[in-house]
Amino acid sequence: MSMTKINWYPGHMKKTKDLIKENMQLIDIVLEVVDARIPLSSKNPDITVFAKNKKRVIVLNKSDLVEKSEILYWKKYFKENNMADEVLEISAETGFNIRALYSIIDKVSAEKKEKMKAKGLRKVNTRLMVVGIPNVGKSRLINRIVGKSSAGVGNKPGFNRGKQWVRIKEGLELLDTPGILWPKFESDEVGQNLAITGAIRDEILPIEDISCILISKMIKYGLWDILKERYKLLDEDKSEVIGEILEKIALRNKMFNKGENLNIQQAAYTVLRDYRNCRLGKFGLDK
């Protein structure tokens, strides 16, 4: 399905990009948080360039929103393509696998510690930078790691107080950075996936188009029955014109404006919210 190209790169993101680049020399490990539903679309190519000489850990957050088979595929993909030293699936929301993340950080930083000890330095600090796109769950992850609400947490993309150093424990410090995207997406699909999952503010998006793209993907993946059951649709409602399906969702679920016209926008938001909250099944969008 074609649509207007999606792009969102406000001025503060350029400043954050410069901040990340400038501080990279202070860092031992780069922990990049990606969305398990769109691991490739949510991986910032700029970070790959900046962190090429650093130890890299990719964290697949929101892993409870996709099937285990997809997680295994992407863990293997990132390792085989030399995109990370370690890859771990977590859920910052539930706390799943947070303890395992500590172990991975210790494992990845062990080489530096051994080198420093060989030089006679007993006290060795490991510095970790946490990066990721907006609304990927970085702040919640940091709260889980630190064990308290030291990082501001928002449920809208773009919420963060700026660069923050956080001491996790003796010998381990963490640099939190605001979520950023990149100036030009590699394809229309990358922008669409970011929009569907909430990495770009809904207010600036053609929300009906985004919802139609999601519906189209679900039909392509063989998930029509989920849509049918969730929104009281009939087999006859299935159409190659996806906008007509959105209209049927509004009709079957009695979504009307004050003038008794179909509220297509309400239907569009409903479909997107349901996907983001895993009410349409566990599946990713990077295929």
State what each model feature region is.
Residues 1-29, 37-38, 43-45, 50-56, ...:
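Helix-rich effector regions associated with P-loop NTPase G domains
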Residues 32, 58-60, 130:
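Structural beta-sheet core signal
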Residues 45-48, 72-75, 102-104, 143-145, ...:
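Short, glycine/charged-enriched secondary-structure capping and boundary segments
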Residues 64-131, 150, 254-256:
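Canonical P-loop GTPase G-domain recognition
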Residues 92, 142, 172-175:
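Conserved active-site beta-strand-loop modules that form the wall/rim of enzyme catalytic pockets
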Residues 100, 104, 140, 213, ...:
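Alpha-helical scaffold segments in soluble metabolic enzymes
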Residues 112-116, 143, 149-155, 221-226:
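Short, structured loop/turn "capping" segments at alpha-beta junctions
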Residues 127-147, 177:
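Glycine-rich phosphate-binding P-loop
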